[in-house]
A protein has these predicted regions:
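Short helix/turn-capping signatures at newly exposed starts of structured segments
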Residues: 1-126, 137-138, 144-169
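Active-site beta-strand termini and strand-to-loop segments that position acidic
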Residues: 131-136
Length: 169
């Protein structure tokens, strides 16, 4: 853990973060909202008082940094789970923290590549995305910027929607 301007910067160690990613990605899908809530609680994530689909992780500085998305066709099912793997900064990281973000991002990519094969990668001025499409049709999207690292695990139904949209283009 590092401190920047009085704020603590936290990172899930890659072993722990990858274990959480695997638990979600390798879960039986479709996943019910109650199964997602059980995983949320198992990971020690704190739900918002008024909405259990929004939560706070241990790497947060107290703000909500995770979300469980409902499937649009059946709200008892989950479409995605999104959470931060680091504290979210409000300005670009100082060099020492930028180095931590970059090295941790690389460690996550290496660990997930060793589990799921080579990812596809997109980069922009804002940051980088690595995407793994699993045989189960679950997708893992790891994002890194100069301010944070996050991950989205999307259901097979989301991949079906993405493919349908691509066919329409």
């Amino acid at each position: 853990m590092s401190t920047i301007k009085g704020e603590q910067f936290r990172v899930y160690p890659p072993e722990e973060g990858v274990a959480i990613i695997r638990a979600i990605a390798e879960h039986r899908w479709p996943m019910t909202i109650n199964e997602a809530f059980a995983l949320r609680d198992q990971f020690g994530w704190r739900p918002a008082p008024d909405d259990g689909t929004i939560f706070t992780t241990p790497v947060s500085n107290g703000e909500e940094d995770g979300y469980i998305g409902n499937d649009v066709t059946d709200t008892s099912l989950v479409s995605r789970i999104n959470f931060n793997l680091t504290t979210r900064l409000y300005s670009d990281a100082e060099p020492q923290i930028d180095h931590i973000i970059r090295s941790q991002y690389k460690a996550y990519v290496d660990a997930l590549n060793s589990l799921y094969g080579q990812s596809s990668m997109e980069s922009s001025a804002v940051g980088v995305l690595n995407v793994w499409n699993l045989r189960s049709r679950v997708s893992i999207v790891l994002g890194g910027t100069r301010r944070f690292i996050d991950v989205v695990i999307e259901s097979p139904a989301m991949m079906d929607l993405t493919e349908a949209e691509q066919r329409l283009r």
